[in-house]
Amino acid sequence: MSGGRLPIGHGRAGGFTLVEVMIAMALGLLLTAGIVSVFVSTGKAGSVQMRMARLQEEARYAVGRIGEDLGMVGAQYCSNGGGLATARTWAYQDRLRSPLSYVPVADLSLPDNSVTLATTPTAPFALPSSFFMRGYQCSTTDCRPDVPLAIAPAMGSGAGSRVRGADVLTVRYLSGRGWAVRADAASPLAPFDIVSSTGDPPLGTFAVGDLALLADCAQAQIFPVTRAGTRFTPETRFPGSVPAGVDTLTDVRLFDFNRDFVTVTYYLKLVADADPDAPPGHRVAALMRKVNGDAAQEIARGVERLDFLYGIENDEGGTLYLTADQVDAGVDAAGVAIACPPQPPASATTKGCLWRAVKTIELHLLVNSSDELPTLAAGELAYRYSCDASVTCTSNADAAPPAAPLTTPLDNGLGKRLLRREFTGVISVRNYNP
């Protein structure tokens, strides 16, 4: 039976030594740590990229939406020439003139209006330049000129407040297609009829008490009317002055001044963050667009700075970029007075006359990612904003960028650990500003 005996030592159990096990565990931990690190880095990069993509999309839409309205500033029907109107024998040879109002300023009921006239007109007057465009340059403490509460809320750090240090801008232009008019060329203007055609708005939208704006490609007049069916009878609020006749050789159209003369105001507002995962009391900045005095609508979220520079054409043909308070005061950056451009006949005031000379508007937006990301590195927090060094913007056309990024946000109630990027645009004013 000795042939079936196993050799000595073949029955002992085999395995790893304690040192080998410890080495394997250490290698496993290192491998696990590496995998976790890759996942964490990938997650962080994805989070940053997602926020950056959202930031860029918000900025793209904001610049486009503002640009559409700024490009329409001062638009009138069929009379957007590039020079001062001079009455000619034939109306179609005339150039642009500002609409002539046959009602007092208070009766125009212009929404978001902060323009006051030194004297109350007692006769028909041309709408001042600042009725079509007026900006407000704001620091963290005040705005110049002051922004009435009827236009935008007061600056503050709570939800519902206007963002500190952000400009405000109100523009107006004529929109809509109006109605064709059958009228006599005789002056004064006699009762006239509306000729509706396909695509015209319903005549019922012209409400009782609305003012009429009548344009004939050479001039525009604003006056009260009474309506009976399709017949309109012009009136006046200035005794002894009645609307003038129109040129029947041109395409005369009637507009509802209260509805078609559009007022648009832009400002920034702090809104409460509705995200259930957001910290309590977290606020975000939003770009607001207010039309015809109605409730403001949120256009884009994350816009924390809004600044405008206005390129005016001086009497020598040069272009100067000024802030809103400089345009309103009629001075350059050094405080030197700038001559007013020629004013339309019967102009009510020369105050704010440089708004008539605005040819381009330079837009600056600082847009953030809305929600803070604690893991952001210093390089990711760095950004450059043309208006960060002071409350006064420097035009990109006039100065080189700073040597180093500016990384100190304004004290405007928003978080510090946010992605921030500047977006700019230069919008040409296509219509000669009245």
Identify the role of each PLM range.
Residues G67-H364, S370-L419, P434:
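N-terminal pilin/flagellin-like segments and related low-complexity appendage regions
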Residues F16-V19, I23-G67, G71-V73, N433-P434:
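Aliphatic-rich helix starts adjacent to a transmembrane/signal segment
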Residues G15, I35, A45-G46, V246, ...:
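General secondary-structure edge motif
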Residues M1-F16:
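N-terminal leader/signal peptides at the extreme start of proteins
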Residues A13, A220, T424:
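Short coil/loop residues immediately preceding or within conserved phosphate-binding loops
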Residues R420-P434:
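Structural signal for terminal/edge beta-strands and the immediately following C-terminal loop/tail
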